[in-house]
């Protein structure tokens, strides 16, 4: 399935859900993809990509950004506190804010840098012990701390539903949590 096919499916799903296709951003996940495949998608005109690891992104995206204007890069995977500085330099959006220690260190690094990309709070709606993310019961208080104590630019919420669950209930729950907290962005993957 090519990029045009994927974009057509996204547009059909948006229309079926009563949404505007233009309101949905497709993040092409480029983790572990060979550079030749990423380059082909860039040449096809797509500009929004996601990576799971800071180190992998550092190895491929500076050259792609030099060759292709308008690239927007999203960090989708866990962010270790020792990788905050390079993450802030490389990524346009971070989708994996999931704990107070990370929020505090992001705030400190962003203040020193003078800027912070938009952030999505990762929510563990399935309460899976092996997955990162804020427990839904702790979310509202965490968002308040991120706003009030750390002054972080929260853009929305992110979820990766459990593999064995139907995703719709997790997506619906995330949308309700985002609305309750005045967050417009929803990052719903896999």
Model-inferred region functions:
Residues 1-190:
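Conserved alpha/beta-domain cores
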């Amino acid at each position: 399935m090519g990029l045009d096919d994927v974009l057509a499916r996204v547009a059909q799903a948006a229309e079926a859900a009563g949404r505007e296709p233009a309101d949905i951003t497709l993040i092409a996940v480029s983790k572990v993809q060979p550079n030749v495949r990423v380059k082909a998608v860039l040449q096809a005109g797509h500009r929004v990509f996601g990576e799971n690891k800071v180190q992998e992104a550092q190895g491929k995206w500076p050259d792609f950004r030099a060759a292709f204007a308008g690239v927007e890069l999203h960090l989708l995977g866990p962010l270790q506190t020792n990788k905050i500085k390079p993450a802030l330099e490389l990524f346009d959006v971070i989708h994996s804010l999931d704990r107070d220690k990370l929020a505090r260190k992001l705030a400190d690094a962003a203040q020193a840098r003078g800027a912070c990309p938009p952030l999505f709070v990762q929510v563990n709606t399935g309460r899976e012990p092996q997955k990162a993310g804020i427990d839904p019961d702790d979310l509202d208080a965490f968002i308040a701390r991120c706003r009030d104590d750390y002054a972080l630019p929260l853009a929305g919420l992110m979820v990766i539903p459990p593999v064995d669950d139907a995703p719709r209930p997790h997506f619906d729950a995330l949308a309700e949590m985002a609305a309750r907290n005045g967050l417009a962005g929803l990052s719903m993957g896999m």
